[in-house]
């Protein structure tokens, strides 16, 4: 191992944050980016929370494409060094975990993700190292679905699939869950999981795609392809070094390394309310959240340094997910955690929780070690060094022991150790040499076989040539079949010979035979006798006889073991060979007969020839001898010469005869050898038959013995099992008794300790009570008040959290409505003027930005509230209750709170019913007023036509009489008086109609509105829409002007002459201002009308009584004295008559009733609420914070003022004012209140929806939305644009 690795001991979990971009649904809802990344630093900020991690990708940080290079690639290097590695993706649903990991791989080249890059990198490194290392790579793919582990690569079972993202159907047969097992060294393994061996990247990718298609997915409101299970893709790799034996002996490194790479894609945490899950989806989400909760508990337990040092319990077994990730979290693995988050402000709460869990995971310490397959142990560098030191210590201890006893034993031990090492080295060398000799033997056997075949082929050709065949016929003869037959026979003979030789001799004996034969050749010749030669069969048989008793030694034992191991294989081979031998024996005999007959004929023919030649030579010799005897009797010289010649010839013939004898002997010897070979072949066949019969007998005997042994073994095993069972029972009883005894001892000890502790607690409680009485006083003193304050604080926190949650959800809904309105304004630009539309869009965008910041802050508070609730849930909430009186006081106070809340609920229900009756009465009045409006609409149309004619007549009359107006004033008074009266009547009707239109805006009945009123309202609205800058002021002044004119408008139905005269005089005075200013301005009461923004000044006329400005400030008005001089003096009373006063009183009472019914519920006087962070749960004595006055928001009201009714309205019978709400000292959580009470204000019900048309928005212009306390106060322009 390298030095850096040896120095490495513990490694923290690397935490990476990946921020995905905003997706289309979030952009349509108007979501904004609420996550901020510090430039150049791995730091994330969301609201008031700031987190620091190892790496941050996405948003303004590093690009997400660098996750693999910076975080995952170092883990692959560690994988090749023998360490386990894990990459897991964590986050809420829809945050991009599956996309980041690449689990949804389909085989396409453009599919991104970490897993495809891991596969490519692993095979690239394996190809680069394949010269010195052999790799075995396997993959497995599992999922945890509903807390059950399933194999995604199991081809025998159909995977669970989802159709159309909603209905889950399983094809038969059903999947079988995989069991989790624990190994002896504490590791986790899966029983029966499929581990497929892969050679290339394409094979691994195909398994990944197959498993991904089988994974359980579903559709929710937050994600159309939501993963419904946790998936773990595991890559197992074994490495084996291919160096030489000497290198292995000198190198102390591991020969086989085994490592695993876990790629985990977790299912996202989800809220059922946001995902809209129900039925099966809800159950799946519950299981997902349960597993993630267990994972969070494990991360919290491992991330707490104090608990880790104390060795606190880690709940790995709470979930199968945490049990499978046991090595990855705090175990034998190098781990990287990728926290995937969404930057949308609508997911701010889930994002904060994810970042908190990721921050805790940074504190987890893993201890990764190398797994050595040959040693079957984890090899940690530190542990290996300790083991080495221990061995040295043991050696030194043994040396010390031997030194005390004497030095001879130590020296002998060292010598023995050296001998053992030398023998082991020699044994390895001999084994290596044996393998080389076996290879050379196989090569020589193959060459001998080829030579034998070639020799036999040549013999056949020679025999054919001797029989008289021509060379062409011999070449054309198809000898391939004969050669094949011969080859098979030779191979079979060699196999049988080798089998016989293997049974008799061993390879070591043969080597010793050759060595001894070379060394003691003379000694063997002396033993065999002078008549036997070395190469004869007798000599060979003698040699065999002498060498047979030589012991085989260790080689014999090895061969016997090899034979016993190979005997089973040979049995099957021999059974097949028996059939083939029976078929080939006939052919072998025929071939042998044909060969022997040819040789026999050849040798007999040769013998006959030699016999004839021998007879001829003997006859000639006899003749020569006879002639020689005759010659010896004569003494002639010629006879002497002839005798010499005959002797010479006789010697020659005798030498020829001796040569022929030798040849005859040689031929006879060959014949004898042939006979011996035939006899050997017969003996060989007999041996084959005998071996076969012995084999059958042995097989039967083995079978019988095996059956007997099996029955005996079964009986013995049964007996042993019974004995073991009885022993286990006895052992169980013994352990039970021991455990019982131990428990009794422990109980006794615990009872003693409990008694001591109870005595101690009793003393402490008595002292605490005494100190409490001294501190808090009596039972009705400040102690009970402290308990009540603590309970009030707890209830306040709960109510505050509930309000935050509901306000958060309402804020999301309002923002969605604003986003839709912005989209509608952008899609339909012709609905408004460009400047108004741009101002409206900018105002809505400002509202979106403020809403986003408010949502982020609320999400932060909700996250803190949930953490506090988890921390104080259970016993922690009641730690301040230390005695029975405290508990009684607490219960009494809670009972009082519950009873008072019920009574308040009943009071509220009664008040709601009363207000509902009032609303019904007001609705009836509104219906009656709408009927009056319909009657007056026909009169308005006629009077509008008359007004147009009167305006034209007045304008024509002004031009010719401009210079002579002073002289003709008196004659034209009557005509002007009549015209002014008509104009005033038309305007009074027009304003009364408008006031009724305002009241009709609150009509929630089913009565229809006339088309004429809508048209008139649109026309009047168009007159005031000329100036976009003064749009807000015109609306407000118009509403105020209409109310004032309605109050001042005379009642034509009164029936008195005096009122008619006063009405005519008022209309005459107003007509003068109308002559001067036919178009009324919409300036505010603080305006001086000095600029062209005033419509009256812009049109060249003067402001009148119907304008929004006031006389004391306006500079565009004519002096009242000039009016009196030019138009006559008309007294106008500043107050109305008695009948008008009665009508106004009745109208005010109706308006008061309507305001009380439409206004929001009055704020109850509750105790001042504190922030969530300031409310503690453990301290009882803390005093409450200073009361903080709640902000009183201005309420928008609508006044309903009828003008010119056909009949004088009668006052309602019930004129008593609506009773005010009583002061209630305590407000319970909204979750405890009755759901039947409708707390939505009436103005919110009648408010215009964003999706309605522009005309309905204009009609409902007076509907004002109730403001939220968290929303900042808008300016007048934003409010007016929102009302539209």
From Swiss-Prot:
In this chain the Kinesin motor domain maps to: 12-364
The residues forming a coiled coil are: 407-445, 561-711, 911-950
Gene3D superfamilies attached here?
Kinesin motor domain
Compositionally biased tracts (Basic and acidic residues): 1158-1172, 1275-1284
Q: Does the keyword Coiled coil apply?
A: yes
Compositional bias annotation for Polar residues: 1043-1070
Q: Does the keyword DNA-binding apply?
A: no
Annotated GO CC locations:
microtubule; microtubule associated complex
Q: Where is this region: Disordered?
A: 1040-1070, 1158-1284
Q: Which domain of life is it from?
A: Eukaryota
Gene Ontology annotations of biological process type: cell wall organization; microtubule-based movement; mitotic spindle organization; spindle elongation
Role noted for this protein: Microtubule-dependent motor protein involved in the control of the oriented deposition of cellulose microfibrils.
* PANTHER family according to UniProt: CHROMOSOME-ASSOCIATED KINESIN KIF4A-RELATED, KINESIN-LIKE PROTEIN KIN-4C
- What's written under domain? Composed of an N-terminal domain which is responsible for the motor activity of kinesin (it hydrolyzes ATP and binds microtubule) and a central to C-terminal alpha-helical coiled coil domain that mediates the heavy chain dimerization.
Q: What is this protein called?
A: Kinesin-like protein KIN-4C
